[in-house]
Amino acid sequence: MKTILRFKWPISILVIIVIVLSLIFAPNLSQLAKEKGEIKPPDSTSSQKYEHMLKDVGANSNSIVAVIKMKEPLSEQGNDKVEHFIKEIKKIDGVNQVISPYTNKDTFKKVVSKDKKTIPVEMTTGDSVKVADKINKIDDHPGKVYLTNNDLVTHDINKATDKGLQKTEIVTVALILIILFVVFRSVVTPFIPLFIVGLSYLFSSAIIAFLVKYCDFPVSVYIQPFLVALLFGIGTDYCILLLNRYKEELAAHDDKTKAVYETFVSGGKTILICGSTIFVSFLVILFAQFDLFRSAVGIGVGVVCLLIIMYTLLPLIMVLLGEKIFWPSKKATSHKENRFWGKLGNLSSKHAFVVILVILAVFLPLIYFTPNKITYDNTNEISNHYGSVKALDIIKDKFELGEAFPVTIAIKDNDKLTTSKGLSDLETLTKSINKIDNVKGVNTITRPTGTPIKQLSATNQLNEIQQQLTKANKGLGQVNNGLGTMQQKVQPLTQSQVVQQQMQQASQNPQAGVQSITQQASQLSQGLQQAQQGNEQVIDGQKEIQSYLKGMSQDDSVNRSGMYISQDMLNNKDMKRSIDQYSANHGNVVLLNVELKQNPYSKSAFKTLNNIKNTVDNQKNGTVFKNSKIEYGGVTSQNADLDHTINTDMTKVIILMSLVTFLVLVVFKRSIIMPLYMMFSILITYYVSMGIANVLFDYSFGEKGVLLVAPFFSLVILFSLGIDYAIFLLNRFNEEVRTHDIHNALITAMKKMGTVIVTACIIIVGTIAALYTSGMLTLMQIATILILGLLIYNLFILPLFIPAVVSTLGKGNWWPLKGPKKQQHK
């Protein structure tokens, strides 16, 4: 610190130059967050492998639904505007496989709402946002059109984040100014923290942007709102701690430089411990798999930038302004003690066991009995003023969500799968999936509208064979008729009397005789012709029947699938259309859409997905799919992967964060016991606040639970803030214990730090509350959990539980060492 004070001007100028250059050349962090901050599971999960599988074969994995709201019911005979609109969509580059309600009658019944006023038009595409923009630019819409899919919802969330960030920044600055004016009663003081923290925010945003662009640093759309809330909150807390300490040191020293030095030697050490703990705590998040979680490391980067500016620019400001920092307050050099916290400390130390018992008796049941519901439905993230959410609300109202967001299955093989055998096995697999509980239906090549194609069923084809046999019988009848005619005409010629009579007539009338013989020959010829035609029909019928029966007998899968798919059927026009719709890569990839009876965002849908996976694994043996790669996509699959990833990451991060924080605190505190109860107090606070928040969201606000990312971010942020406040108090306790006994040192520390901690808590609660202005449900839920946690920690844990534990342990607080060395009071 002496070096910094000695070279304060060169160091400050250098820091300012670095900050200015970084701001000039830094990429746009908001834009980078939109481009690279997609919320998705790791690449190793099935839902991402599904995406990559389709991209590798040149197929589009994104499906957009255009929801058309009509004023008048749609007619089955057609609607010119709707048909024109669909034709215009088909012309757009990047749009494939548009499913029109007029494809056939079955499709019309399936996709059009019961009142026939709502039509979802589904299409596949590569770039959802670009395609959506082009669709919105089509001039003649048949009604109100809303477009939706995961990408479009995310795009709208990004837009909402940008708007919310601007509001959050304004509200945060206003709250800090108001609170600091009240606390310090000074015109100058409030602007010092704002300057330091504002500069830190800009500097850290620039550094993170560089890291994202050039080092593939993890980023998300939430990083900037969190940076605003936390840097302004934590930074202001640190400034308050240092400014309050500076008040004390100014009263004790006439020299401003000496006062600044003592401030940073004592208070600065506390800040350094807090900042280092936060940084390493956030650094371990890099070991998580989920990129959204890993983006929280940016907060650690922000804290480092904050410390750099606080240790370089703030000392210069303090030396330059001195007591004028607190102008016009006349009591600038007095520091008022918090008597209320002193009384709480006295109470908890005298009745330590009772205080600990009461707090645990209240908090542990709250943790155990309150619900812990996590929802993966991000459709409530923003309001339905955005088109993607409006479309989802219409789908929820008019249709089943399971139909709109099916589980998608992709089966890939080195060999062609769209063969007779392959499609028969596909139908067998489809039948098994269709029997699973909570599966509403399956769409694939053999059942494009959810029901098996009638012409493919073996029963239907046996009926065709019966018709062929009937045809053959008619042919045999023709043969019999022809032979009968020949016999009738030839038989008289075999009788001698008749022959003699005809010969006699011929001699008397030669011309008549010739005519009679000619007639006989003609009749004989016709009879032979009938016989020949009948015989050909019989032969053709026999060949056709033999071909069908031979094919069926050689296809082992007919009994399982109930289908026999001949080569002629594969060449059928309608069949080719179905193959094109549900296959890719020239038949090496086949697709299935599994519609669920459940909400695809629910956890119960995850169980159904697991049942589908188990069924497919069991049924693929003995089929052409036994060596195929099978991956699962769709909302349910993605959320199931997120669920597994989040649970794994939460466990991993809690262990690593606790371990690293413990080691850092052991080094600074020179104690094993003190870090343990510090971390325990924070974890119990987190779980209590989560329990209360779940009750609030479930019963009071009508939500279906806490959104998936809220628990994680609430944990890591509350952990960091709680550690800060505990360090504030216990560091001062370690100072005071050098000149007092444990009881008096504790009471003195609480009196000295009570106002600082309460003020810091009010400020951080205010900055976090500013997240409510963002309009984003995730940020509002995180804000609620954090505010609950901060209130619980600063009303019950820090002033009651921690002092009670400290008093109970006595000298054991510093085990295995003896604690700080005693020295005489100055």
PLM regions and their residue ranges:
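Feature of extramembrane
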Residues: M1-T172, V183-V188, H335-G345, K350-M650, ...
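Membrane-embedded transmembrane helical bundles of large multi-pass transporters/channels
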Residues: M1-A33, V95, G126-K373, P600, ...
